[in-house]
């Protein structure tokens, strides 16, 4: 946004004025000074809940800052908005819909919303039945062979969430009657499919078409390609489509029209946003990988956080704290980029998942009342598995000119379960896990304390280009271990963080109008590239020039 616009107009509300005052008062305060002044700072600025610990002591905050952030949340009626979210209110104001992803993880015996719970569990039970059938080797393709490969075709929320969770929980893959592999395809250019189809047998491959609207061109173009691949190998008859495709969508009629058998149609609802949908039948690939019990544990972990979010005071409420720390960094300290750094290779796709969750939800510039925002909203979210990131962009974090806030994420335990395939190598692998943990702690320490973290003797003659300023804020999330339950907790924490920030910024986190128009313009350009239309006069000079090169009318 323009530098002339205040991050928060100072005159609006008392907590905002107080926070601006605290910024000016503490502008030169270093994180190392906060720790020096408060010996029990870790105890005062960390929360333990269930299977995780949230340490936010390495942020540039004081008790006074926290008090005013809580006061800001109260002036924005955060408690009221949380109550609205967990009702059936239409908190998605631009589409006049509720946002009830939390309902997808309600226990079957939950009594507050009996009809809603029944709808959700009816679809989950249908999904579980298919999972059991595939696992038992009883689901067969058109030629009678057992399915051994399942390909999820989706994009955005129908791809990022399921792929992230499936990869993260690879240690919990269940045994099946015959080996079962799950794959993911999302890109509309066909490159992923081209590589994958060479490895698969049509007779033993099942495809999931995962699309809330069943109209997304990325997904349907890939689906049409694999349909042709199947029909070329197995023949053009209804049995091929009915045996080799499962659909997940809100649009039963569109799935039927495409040829998907009713018994292979799993339903969603309009009140589930795509980026919040992995808890639903969109999570079919997850259930295929970790089994029904594992999937239910994933839901249970998220539900535990739902209860924590609704029933815990702001002072101990982890999603609220995560959100308010982000507000402080973004809107008051002018830190507008946030790195997510998991120190576990299984969380390889977690940063990409959060990019959609946070930036598609809160990357908005219009308030709920239709007025332009008067403050910066979502920061740029990025990240990578921590040990790899250390050899890529940590140079910028430590010695660059950009202020960056970070989330460090790590499991406390790993390689200690006897059902894992690597149990015979556990001792060596545990040492590697400790190596990752030591790096996680070292990096957060160095980012916070800078030169203070170095040995004084070493620092004495250290040239300036080897020195560290520090004062880069970070949180650390420690999971007891990375399992379905704790991962469900972790994801739900970030979901609710996003919601809290949307309340403070007065924006709608449940729509994504910014992604719509580009698709429509692409539809207008496609006939030109296909040769069905020649008139370029309505286009800008750049687009005209690029199209001429693509059509071979001028040299590139």
Curated annotation (Swiss-Prot):
GO biological process, one term: gluconeogenesis
Pfam families assigned to the protein according to its UniProt record, in alphabetical order: PGI
Entries under InterPro entries matching the protein: G6P_Isomerase, G6P_Isomerase_C, Phosphoglucose_isomerase_CS, SIS_dom_sf, SIS_PGI_1, SIS_PGI_2
Pathway noted in the entry: Carbohydrate biosynthesis; gluconeogenesis; Carbohydrate degradation; glycolysis; D-glyceraldehyde 3-phosphate and glycerone phosphate from D-glucose: step 2/4
Family, as annotated: Belongs to the GPI family.
Upper lineage: Bacteria, Pseudomonadati, Pseudomonadota, Gammaproteobacteria, Moraxellales
Cellular component aspect of the GO annotation: cytosol
Paired cysteines (S-S): none
Function of the molecule: Catalyzes the reversible isomerization of glucose-6-phosphate to fructose-6-phosphate.
Catalytic activity: alpha-D-glucose 6-phosphate = beta-D-fructose 6-phosphate
Keyword terms, alphabetized: Cytoplasm, Gluconeogenesis, Glycolysis, Isomerase
Identification of the protein by name: Glucose-6-phosphate isomerase
Compartments it resides in: Cytoplasm
EC number: 5.3.1.9
Active-site residues per Swiss-Prot or TrEMBL entry: 360, 391, 519
Any one GO molecular function term: monosaccharide binding
